[in-house]
Amino acid sequence: MSYSKKDDDGDESIFANVNQVTVTQDARAFNSSSISPRKSRRLLSKIAYLIYTGEHFQEKQATELFFGITKLFQHKDPSLRQFVYIIIKELSVVAEDVIMITSSIMKDTATGRETIYRPNAIRSLIRVIDANTVPAIERILTTGIVDPISAVASAALVSAYHLYPVAKDIVSRWNNEVQDAVTSHNVGRKVASSPFFTSTLGYTPNASGISQYHALGLLYRIRRHDSIAMNKLLQLLVSNLGTVSNSHAFVMLIRYISSLMDQNTQFRDQMVPFLHGWLKSKGDMVNLEVARNMVRLKNISDDDLQPVVSVLKIFLSSHRSATRFSAIRTLNELAMTRPHLVHSCNLNIESLITDVNRSIATYAITTLLKTGNDESVDRLMKQIVTFMSDISDNFKIIVVDAIRSLCLKFPRKQDSMLTFLSNILCDEGGYEFKRAAVDAISDMIKYIPESKERALAELCEFIEDCEYPKIAVRILSILGEEGPKASEPTRFIRYIYNRIMLENAIVRSAAVSALTKFGLNAEDKFVQRSVKVILTRCLEDADDEVRDRAAFSVKALEDRDAFLPVVKSDKIPSLPALERSLVIYISERKFGQGFDIKSVPVLSQEEIDAENLRIKKATTEVEFTEVTPAEDQNALASSNIETEFLNALESVSEFNEYGPVLKSSPSPIELTEQETEFVVKVVKHVFKDHLVVQFQLHNTLSEVILENAVVVSTPSTDDLVEECVVPAAIVSGEPVSIFVSFKFNDSVPYPLTTLTNTLQFTTKEIDIHTGEPEEEGYEDEYKIDDLDVSAGDFISPAYESNFDGLFDSLEHEASEVYVLSLLDSFRSTCSRVAELLQMQPLEGTENPTDKPVHVMKLSGKLVNGEKVLALVKMAHSKDGEGITIKVIARGESDSSVELVVGGIA
């Protein structure tokens, strides 16, 4: 064939004029007595083109096509048969009565059929059956799962995976066959001889063993809710490493091991040596996967991570870009939580700043920013400027996020960082990039008071030429909040006024709201009058939203004393609690009485700022970080914990008279191991005069139920007096709550004690034939771990912008010295003390330097609203064992400071 330019001009795509009408008409050829495989494949490719480009076939039309295509089963051409199965799978979603071709497909699943037919037939078979007909194909799939031919075994395993949601019990019965597919050296290791390979493909493919990967995925799905069975499987595979030969399966095995290591401390200790061994073998893909998963383990020691850092350091000099990228990205992730471990790699990382791959260079810079110190910041900032124009917006956002974190870590370097952020606002970039820069400047304004004046001025300059209305609205909101607090608030009014004159209605509305805050918060009468004049002019605006806001604002300025408490309220309802209360109010449908907003817990601005600061310091590049299924489930479960426990608490009428919940535990505390028959978690709820301990009990035994389950909780001191116990009537498979309420001793406002806990219940066995519990049961008890009531239960983190000034102004002071013998570094001491006291570290003091003495600043608010601050001075003990700390607390009362200094013991 000639491939001249003339031929190219006359060549037209077969998809040029394809539509549903012509395809449906042409499909009548499938009913003819003589079928041309070539023409049929051409027509099937047109149908596939329509489906994959989003064309939707009507049910009747799809059914006609579906049964027309089934006529092609009479032709034995392997390529045509493969295409038939592809289209059958796609049309089976829309067409009617697809189950009628089950027998035709099942013929191709027989072991004696052409090898090319069987995998495709198995995949198509599960698309045309329903849950009721799964038993009819059970033998086909179980035979396929243990088939020695790789394509057949993979097809059967993937099909079983898709069947699991609709036939969970049946697929679970195939547990032994699936485990054989993982551990056997015969299953899925061959490629059958077929004329199709030599005549059509021209070669015979190799057996990749990919069926082992599919089998491991299916086995995990079957066993994932049985941690004991999963533990045994993983230990079996680890002890016989030769069993897992496929690299993809090995990577999946590592991920499953990591997810279980986070849940089981004993299992983690057993697996760490194996992971260290795999760091030096099995190929780069496995090495990097081990490193990434070890970095993400929550409770792993620094010593266990040292081999990981050493291996990643070697990979940084690899000649393969993908390997260097994976290594630097993993180190970047480690630097977010343990920057001190990455210091040894800094020289290697600096060499990557000039890497031709700008993605690698970006991660190198951001990693160095996270591990840098005061001396290296300025040098790194100069290097960043040189390549910012060469990278995409996505990576620019990563750099900006790293700069933002660095601002919070080294507030003294705010001048150079603010200059950098201001310059990139003037550069070309998309909305997300500019928004990230504005958010970074906003954080500097909020958490670094020294930068406020200049940062606000930079935002005012940017807003003059801002092309994104959403960003303009964001900046106006910042100006409205922070501008009135500046030393010269009037300098910002001109920029806001320009927005009213020049921008669209959305921005004008935001400008009106910002001006209103200036008028309400300004003490200068001239400023109030000027703002009122501008707002009065807005009453004639063409947009009704602007007019409405202006009318409200003018009224607020005229009656300033009445509106000021509303506008300047520093108490904000807890949004999760507000949402939960509104849902309950709507579901009860008692609209005769109004919604009681006073029942919703409120948060102060300091508490909100402290939580926001904690989140920002813990932020990772979510867009570029993959999350394993186990991590994703854990995150989802964690987000629902507060609602789950508080809903159960609100359902108990005995606690209604206690008043609002002042504080709850930030996360459930486990009082038993995850693998025990009775799993108990606990959350502490603090009220004004009461402590309610909520025990969540999960009975994992399917053959017994528990009745009248209670927890006998005994305080170690007289500071708590038990008031009532709310038992769980029946405990079967679902978690239930047991409550124990204590009243505070009048003489001790903040009781610190230890609760000794014993679970008591009546056990009744389940009749295996009827599924009903036996009438007779027996009394039993189960010992669970003790629970400490500590200082952190009465303190919430609270952000304070002027720590030194407030510390000097507070009158009540107490101090105490402790030796923490189990800790060996300032970093671990900072983390432990902040966790015990539940106070907010300030000014980056939670990141110690290499100096021999370190001071950490902490801020918090007690449940009664009192502010309390603490200085924690620390030094290495003279004998070299542990860290010596001195806690100096200042607060609004003696009881508050005594609580803080006594909270470390």
UniProtKB/Swiss-Prot annotation:
Membership in a protein family: Belongs to the COPG family.
UniProt key word tRNA-binding: no
A GO cellular component annotation in the UniProt record: endoplasmic reticulum
InterPro entries per record: ARM-like (IPR011989), ARM-type_fold (IPR016024), Clathrin/coatomer_adapt-like_N (IPR002553), Clathrin_app_Ig-like_sf (IPR013041), Coatomer/calthrin_app_sub_C (IPR009028), Coatomer_g_Cpla (IPR032154), Coatomer_gsu (IPR017106), Coatomer_gsu_app_Ig-like_dom (IPR013040)
Signal sequence interval, chain numbering: none
Self-association and partners: Oligomeric complex that consists of at least the alpha, beta, beta', gamma, delta, epsilon and zeta subunits.
Name recorded for this polypeptide: Probable coatomer subunit gamma
GO molecular function (one): structural molecule activity
Entry keywords, A to Z: Cytoplasm, Cytoplasmic vesicle, ER-Golgi transport, Golgi apparatus, Membrane, Phosphoprotein, Protein transport, Repeat, Transport
HEAT repeat ranges, renumbered to this chain: 265-302, 303-340, 374-412, 414-450, 525-563
Main location class: cytoplasm
Role played: The coatomer is a cytosolic protein complex that binds to dilysine motifs and reversibly associates with Golgi non-clathrin-coated vesicles, which further mediate biosynthetic protein transport from the ER, via the Golgi up to the trans Golgi network. Coatomer complex is required for budding from Golgi membranes, and is essential for the retrograde Golgi-to-ER transport of dilysine-tagged proteins.
Pfam family, one: Adaptin_N
Modified residues (Phosphoserine): S604
Superkingdom of source: Eukaryota
Cell compartments where the protein resides: Cytoplasm; Golgi apparatus membrane; Cytoplasmic vesicle, COPI-coated vesicle membrane
The keyword Glycoprotein is annotated on this UniProt entry: no
GO biological process terms held by the UniProt record: endoplasmic reticulum to Golgi vesicle-mediated transport; intra-Golgi vesicle-mediated transport; intracellular protein transport; protein secretion; retrograde vesicle-mediated transport, Golgi to endoplasmic reticulum
Membrane topology designation: Peripheral membrane protein
